[in-house]
């Protein structure tokens, strides 16, 4: 989100990549409809489906609600933060409340494309922004900042 600046993913060339046609529910809103939106940049048709099912909102057919309705955007962000592990072993929420470290939040949210040396510049950018936020809040960032 660029530090919570952008509501939608900025790289439009990526938009068509977030449709997994192997899922039984497909991509009814169109192949390019499931790009990153909201505070955690919810992406992929299967995440829109799961978030929508959990929240009682048809996000599979109406993914634009995440960018057009701030309440929906924050609900999806909190849903992902609290329930999804991504390629990691814990949710981002569990990582923070159990003091496992900020690096586990990166792994839970973007581990497939950033962790394990896949995009060290992006990981560093996230860590730097996190350190700036913790400084503004007058707290320490803790350990295990990287994934």
Describe every region a protein language model picked out.
Residues 84-86, 103-147:
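Extracellular low-complexity, O-glycosylation-prone Ser/Thr/Pro/Gly-rich "stalks"
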Residues 1-80, 101, 105-108:
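Peptidoglycan-targeting cell-wall enzymes and recognition modules
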Residues 68, 96-97, 118-121:
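Alpha-helix capping and helix-loop boundary segments enriched in small/acidic/polar residues
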Residues 5-7, 88-101, 141-145:
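Surface-exposed patches in mature extracellular/periplasmic domains of secreted proteins
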Residues 78-89:
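Flexible secondary-structure boundary motifs
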């Amino acid at each position: 989100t660029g530090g919570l600046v952008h509501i939608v993913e900025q790289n439009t060339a990526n938009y068509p990549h977030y449709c997994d046609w192997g899922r039984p529910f497909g991509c009814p809103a169109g192949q390019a409809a499931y790009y990153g939106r909201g505070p955690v940049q919810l992406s992929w048709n299967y995440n829109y489906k799961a978030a929508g099912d959990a929240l009682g909102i048809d996000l599979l057919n109406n993914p634009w609600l995440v960018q057009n309705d701030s309440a929906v955007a924050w609900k999806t962000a909190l849903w992902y933060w609290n329930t999804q592990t991504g390629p990691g072993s814990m949710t981002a929420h569990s990582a923070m409340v159990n003091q496992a470290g900020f690096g586990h939040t990166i792994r839970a949210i973007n581990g497939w494309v950033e962790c394990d040396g896949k995009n060290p510049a992006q990981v560093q950018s996230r860590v730097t922004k996190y350190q700036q936020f913790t400084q503004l809040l007058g707290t320490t960032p803790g350990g295990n900042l990287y994934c």
